[in-house]
Curated annotation (Swiss-Prot):
Domain of life: Bacteria
GO biological process entries: riboflavin biosynthetic process
Protein name: 6,7-dimethyl-8-ribityllumazine synthase
SUPFAM superfamilies hit by this protein: Lumazine synthase (SSF52121)
Function: Catalyzes the formation of 6,7-dimethyl-8-ribityllumazine by condensation of 5-amino-6-(D-ribitylamino)uracil with 3,4-dihydroxy-2-butanone 4-phosphate. This is the penultimate step in the biosynthesis of riboflavin.
Active site: 88 (proton donor)
Gene this chain is encoded by: ribH
Recorded GO MF terms: 6,7-dimethyl-8-ribityllumazine synthase activity
Similarity comment text for this entry: Belongs to the DMRL synthase family.
EC number: 2.5.1.78
Annotated source species: Acidothermus cellulolyticus (strain ATCC 43068 / DSM 8971 / 11B)
InterPro entries, A to Z: LS, LS/RS, LS/RS_sf
Reactions accelerated catalytically: (2S)-2-hydroxy-3-oxobutyl phosphate + 5-amino-6-(D-ribitylamino)uracil = 6,7-dimethyl-8-(1-D-ribityl)lumazine + phosphate + 2 H2O + H(+)
Annotated GO CC locations: cytosol; riboflavin synthase complex
Keywords: Riboflavin biosynthesis, Transferase
Length: 165
């Protein structure tokens, strides 16, 4: 993990953006930290009351993200999928990630992908935004979704005014 090319951990002025956060209950220690960081990121960006819902696992994220996308301007999916001894890891990681992408494409609502796909618990802990973590994927996914929602708001506003995007 180099973090090379990662944008600065900035905030955006997202006042008025409705944010939904769907988070898995698997690997709760990791995901709970990501939820806390996502909420903190949202508040730092001016979103005071994000909707937060919990689901069983990563595979349940896309359908709940779809429902959230119908009533929110941006959605974030958070989970930690940790490799085990069987190929199940690949199936879950790919299906959940592709599902979130499909929600964004089908609804036109940005969906921040905060699904950690790690080879070990140590890798997950290093990415979940704990005080000694090297990365903060809950924060990053949230700011990315809010930033995209603002871009879409601007593009749609321009289109409604007859201006080029």
């Amino acid at each position: 993990m180099t973090g090379e090319g990662r944008p600065d951990r900035a905030v955006v002025a997202a006042h008025g953006i409705r944010l939904g956060i769907a988070a898995s209950r698997w690997n709760a220690h990791v995901v709970d930290a990501m939820v806390e960081r996502a909420i903190e990121a949202a508040r730092s960006c001016g979103v005071t009351t994000p909707t937060v819902v919990r689901v069983a696992g990563a595979l349940e994220l896309p359908v709940v993200a779809l429902e959230l996308a119908h009533h929110h301007d941006a959605v974030v999916g958070l989970a930690a999928v940790i490799r085990g001894a069987t190929p199940h890891f690949e199936y879950v990681a790919q299906a959940a990630t592709m599902g979130l992408t499909q929600v964004a494409i089908q609804t036109g609502t940005p969906v921040g992908d905060g699904i950690l796909t790690c080879d070990s618990m140590a890798q997950a802990l290093d990415r979940c935004g704990l005080p000694d973590s090297a990365e903060d994927k809950g924060w990053e996914a949230t700011v990315a979704a809010l930033d995209c929602a603002l871009v879409l708001r601007d593009l749609r506003s321009r289109a409604a005014a007859g201006m080029p995007g």
